[in-house]
Amino acid sequence: MTVFYFIRHGKTEWNKASRYQGAHGDSPLLPESYQEIKLLAKHLAAIKFVHAYASPLPRALTTARTLISELPSNIPLTVDSRLREFNLGKMEGRRFDEVKARWPQVVDSFHFHADKFDNRLIDSESFSAVIDRFRAAIEEYAAAYPGSQNVLVVSHGAALNAGINGLLNVPLARLKDRGGLSNTSTTILQTADGKNFQLKKWNETDYLHKTTVDPTDTI
């Protein structure tokens, strides 16, 4: 089995401000995010990773590099644009409440009814486009590392949610059934053939030892 550990990047200033970042927006990690990445590294310390892959967007790449620096072994890192965040078009850079007021149906479908999402209304990517590029990347990694090997993938909330559910062949109408993915969370999939994937863990965050749930942590 090739086992994939999917990590969502650490929380950023725009995450905290409830502002969409997407594929073109970005903001620095919060100071506390670096401590959370250290907790993640401690959680993963016993696992031997053969390779790490990361989105080129600074918030994800910084998370990946910080995480690797905290792990006991030297893990090679490859930057792959196929792991970038969902291109959200006109939503990018805007606050959640502003976007909801301007495009209520778009926001509802994006968060809850992916099968009804019309990307043309905001000049964004479609769910199918994100799923296709994500699948192509992960299948390539699985082919490169068959057998009992562990692969680390650092990406973004919306892209990971769509891409992972795509790997699990979840229909668009059910894409949001498991809920969102939190900052610095771990989701684990395994595959024996590089084509069919099984879910082992979804949105694991216990190692962060959070006592309260901040709604801006999860998308």
Predicted regions and their residues:
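Loop-to-helix element that buttresses phosphate recognition and phosphoryl-transfer chemistry
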Residues: 11-67, 122-135
